[in-house]
Amino acid sequence: MAFDSAAEGYERARPDYPVELFDDLIRHTGVGSGDRVLEIGCGSGKATRPLADRGLRVTCVELGPRLVARARAALAEYPDVEVVHSSFEAWRPPDAVTFDLVVAATSWHWIDPGVRYRKTFDLLRPGGHLASWSAAHVFPHGGDPIFRELQDVYDEIGEGLPPDAACPRPGELPDLRGEIEATGLFDVVSVDQYDWEVVYDAEGYIRLLDTFSGHIAMAPWQRERLYAEIRRRLGERPDGLLRRGWGAVLHIARRRGA
C-alpha cells in the first residue's frame, strides 16, 4: 500500500481540512456528542481529530499498519476513538453495531465500488448519514505559475500530464451527486465545495509530493530530478515559496428506508 510507506510524512505534509467543512457536516447530519461515527481509511487521523473534538465516538478502519500506528499515537488522548487495522471491505462491526454517521475523507475513491455504498448502507442506522470528501488541487485564475512551469520536468522524466488533463478552478471540482442517487440507497442532502490555499517552501512541498501515490511510485532518479528542479526554481524566488490551491467537495447523503 503506497500511502502506508509515507505514514510519518502524511500527518505533517497533508493539509488540514477547513473548519467550515466540519461545521457544515455537523449541521447537515445533526450528529452530536456521543453519537457513533465510522471513519473509513482514517490515515494518520487528519479528519478524526476534528470529529473527536466535537464529542463524537469514532471507530476508524485503516488498512495500512504504519498509518494505524501513527493514528493510534496521534489520537491517544481521545478515549472514544478506536483505530482498527483492517480494510473496510473485510471489516465487520462487533455485535451488529450500527452507526449514526459514516465518514470517508480522501479515501472513498479507494474503496471497491461494488462494496462501498451497499456496505455503508448496512452499517448505518435508518436515517443515518454518509459524508465523503477528497482534497484535490485547484487552479485559481492568476494562481501560482510554477505548476504549469514544472510540467516540462514531468514530461522529461516521463510523468507528464495528458493534453486533456483537467485543471479545475475553485468551485469547479466534479461531484458524486449522480453516482450517489443512482445507488437507490441514499438521498443527497447537500453538496458543498470548500477552497483554500496553503503556502509551501521547497522542502514542505517535497514532503507533500512524497505522500502522493504517483510520486511514491516514481523511480528514485525521477524524484531526484524533479525535486532538484523544485528546489532550484523556488530558490530563485525572493521569498522561496509557492502557493497551492486546494479544494474539497463534501457530499452528505441520508440512508433510505426504515
List PLM regions with ranges.
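Conserved class I S-adenosyl-L-methionine
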Residues: 1-35
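Class I SAM-dependent methyltransferase SAM/SAH-binding core
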Residues: 36, 44-91
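Conserved beta-strand/loop positions that form the S-adenosyl-L-methionine
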Residues: 40
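Conserved Class I S-adenosyl-L-methionine
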Residues: 44, 168-258
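A short acidic, Gly/Pro-enriched loop at the edge of an enzyme's catalytic core
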Residues: 92-102
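Short catalytic micro-motifs in class I SAM-dependent methyltransferases
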Residues: 106
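A short, conserved alpha-helix within the catalytic core of class I
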Residues: 111-120
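Conserved catalytic/acceptor-binding region of the Class I
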Residues: 121-195
